[in-house]
Amino acid sequence: MTTLLNPYFGEFGGMYVPQILMPALRQLEEAFVSAQKDPEFQAQFNDLLKNYAGRPTALTKCQNITAGTNTTLYLKREDLLHGGAHKTNQVLGQALLAKRMGKTEIIAETGAGQHGVASALASALLGLKCRIYMGAKDVERQSPNVFRMRLMGAEVIPVHSGSATLKDACNEALRDWSGSYETAHYMLGTAAGPHPYPTIVREFQRMIGEETKAQILEREGRLPDAVIACVGGGSNAIGMFADFINETNVGLIGVEPGGHGIETGEHGAPLKHGRVGIYFGMKAPMMQTEDGQIEESYSISAGLDFPSVGPQHAYLNSTGRADYVSITDDEALEAFKTLCLHEGIIPALESSHALAHALKMMRENPEKEQLLVVNLSGRGDKDIFTVHDILKARGEI
């Protein structure tokens, strides 16, 4: 099928979906391309970002955790966005696209529940019906977000197949869309999946990096040495990276979930520890068994518990433009506690992975003068019960 935009990032990406979904993807691409050129659409999107979601978000300089080092550390505060995470940015854009295409329903998948909450709020705001697929395990560990979705009128459908987590929710959402695309828009929650989703999600998240660039220049008079973001599917990271890709002096660091440790096999780090394959409509690195079956990923944070990664991250990794590292559950938990105790900010466990790597960079080289920005992609209200149970089991509380 000919496309208006390039469906690949190097060898990664593409449109590996059943033939029945090709017209829906073509319609979506056409709507997106025309919307990008439509000043009225852009004005409506920007108005929602400013007056509903609360953009621009703050860039906060850490006051205490850098003590004794020469690091200056800023946090891009996506946790302050309405809905509690960066997810709100792109769902507002996709919901407007759905209306533009004449759709009346939204289908979504969610892991941590943040994309589900964002999909529910955008649907409520714009008068769209919303059904959300969520792994049964995630329904259990993210009950506050499940209730938020239901409060805003969304139907939450627990998925019991497979590992009962995000990858299974993705499969069910795609299955639903195959039979309902004439009236429903599939609101994919990350910068992954079949073309044109990785491009759409990047463009509807790129204000994160654009704002960061303007804010850091105003505050410090120069660009950062590195921007750091956690990577599950990769939307918050690509939103932060997009405006810095051509700034070759700025390091781009993506942080995958190391789970219980890479050597245990219980992690979610396919970029560095997976093999390229076809999954979820795209060609990308993924965690798979010797015979090509998708392996279960694992992370303390439901939002990073995904066995593959967006194709643009795969490309940035293959060209060496971005570096990808991993952080274990324990390291993320320590960073979570550190930010709570010393800066009075409760971060999402997802974002705590990025913070943990920044703290590691700082502590490994305390003499080095460096200017770092961490994308604090979401707030940790949804994670307090998980953290409470772990700390209680350890006898720390």
From Swiss-Prot:
Enzyme class (EC, first level): lyase
Cofactor(s) essential for the protein: pyridoxal 5'-phosphate
Catalytic activity: (1S,2R)-1-C-(indol-3-yl)glycerol 3-phosphate + L-serine = D-glyceraldehyde 3-phosphate + L-tryptophan + H2O
GO cellular component terms listed in the entry, alphabetical order: cytoplasm
Gene Ontology terms, MF aspect: tryptophan synthase activity
EC number: 4.2.1.20
Source domain of life: Bacteria
Pathway the protein contributes to: Amino-acid biosynthesis; L-tryptophan biosynthesis; L-tryptophan from chorismate: step 5/5
Residues bearing PTM N6-(pyridoxal phosphate)lysine: 87
Keywords: Amino-acid biosynthesis, Aromatic amino acid biosynthesis, Lyase, Pyridoxal phosphate, Tryptophan biosynthesis
Recorded family membership: Belongs to the TrpB family.
PANTHER family associated with the record: TRYPTOPHAN SYNTHASE, TRYPTOPHAN SYNTHASE-RELATED
NCBIfam families listed in its UniProt record: trpB (TIGR00263)
HAMAP family from the UniProt entry: Trp_synth_beta
Record text on subunit structure and interactions: Tetramer of two alpha and two beta chains.
Protein name: Tryptophan synthase beta chain
UniProt organism field: Escherichia coli O157:H7
